[in-house]
A protein has these predicted regions:
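Eukaryote-specific detector of the first structured module of a protein
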Residues: 2-60, 70
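EF-hand and EF-hand-like Ca2+-sensor regions
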Residues: 61-192
C-alpha cells in the first residue's frame, strides 16, 4: 500500500510541490520552489541568473499544471484535482510523453539532487534528498530503497544518470505497478 499509485501521487503533492504545507497547490508554492532550487543547486549561494532560470521553469510548470488540474479555476489545486490530471497526462505514458513543463521540473529536480554535479545521483546524494524530505528513523531503510531502485547498469555506474532518473520518474507517476523499481525513486514511502 505504501507504494500504491495513489500514495505516490500524494507524496509528490505533499513533499515536493506543497511547499507551504497548506494542503493544496497554488502559485506561491511554485515561486517558493524556484527559490529553493536556486539555493540548493548553488549550495547556499544565491545567483540572480539561476533564480530567473528557475522562476521561468516553475512559472511554466504552474501554468501547465493549473491548466491541466485546476478544474474549478479557483487558483488552487487539491490533491484530488492533481491526481485526476496526472491520471489523464501520465498513466500509461513514457517520460517523453509527459507535459513539457513537468519534464523541465524533473530535470531541475535531478540537478538539485546531484549535489556534486557529476551527472550521477549516488547513494550519498539519494540519502541526503530523502532525509531532507521525509522523516527517517533508520538510514538502512533509505539504503535498501536505493538498492531496490538500481539495476545492474546503475550499480556499475555508481547511481542514476539523468536519463535513468527520467525513466524512473516516468514510472513513479505513470505506472500503477507497485513492484516496479521506480516506486523507490524518493526513498521509503510511508502511508499518509
Amino acid at each position: 500500500m505504501a507504494y500504491s499509485w495513489d500514495n505516490r501521487v500524494d507524496f509528490v503533492v505533499r513533499y515536493m510541490y506543497d511547499i507551504d504545507n497548506n494542503g493544496f497547490l497554488d502559485q506561491k508554492d511554485f515561486e517558493c520552489m524556484a527559490v529553493r532550487a536556486c539555493i540548493i543547486e548553488g549550495k547556499g549561494e544565491f545567483s540572480p541568473a539561476k533564480l530567473a532560470e528557475y522562476q521561468h521553469i516553475m512559472r511554466s510548470l504552474w501554468e501547465e499544471i493549473s491548466d491541466l488540474a485546476d478544474f474549478d479555476k479557483d487558483g488552487r489545486i487539491s490533491t484530488a484535482e492533481f491526481k485526476e490530471a496526472v491520471q489523464k497526462t501520465c498513466i500509461g505514458k513514457k517520460y517523453a510523453d509527459f507535459p513539457q513543463a513537468m519534464k523541465a521540473f524533473i530535470e531541475a529536480n535531478f540537478k538539485m539532487i546531484d549535489i556534486d554535479n557529476d551527472g550521477i545521483i549516488g547513494a550519498k546524494e539519494y540519502r541526503y534528498n530523502c532525509i531532507t524530505r521525509i522523516a527517517i528513523e533508520d538510514i538502512q531503510m533509505v539504503d535498501d530503497a536505493f538498492d531496490k531502485l538500481l539495476d545492474d547498469e546503475d550499480r556499475r555506474r555508481g547511481g542514476l544518470t539523468l536519463a535513468r532518473y527520467q525513466e524512473l520518474y516516468g514510472h513513479f507517476l505513470g505506472n500503477t505497478d507497485e513492484t516496479h523499481p521506480g516506486v523507490y525513486l524518493f526513498g521509503p514511502l510511508s502511508l499518509n
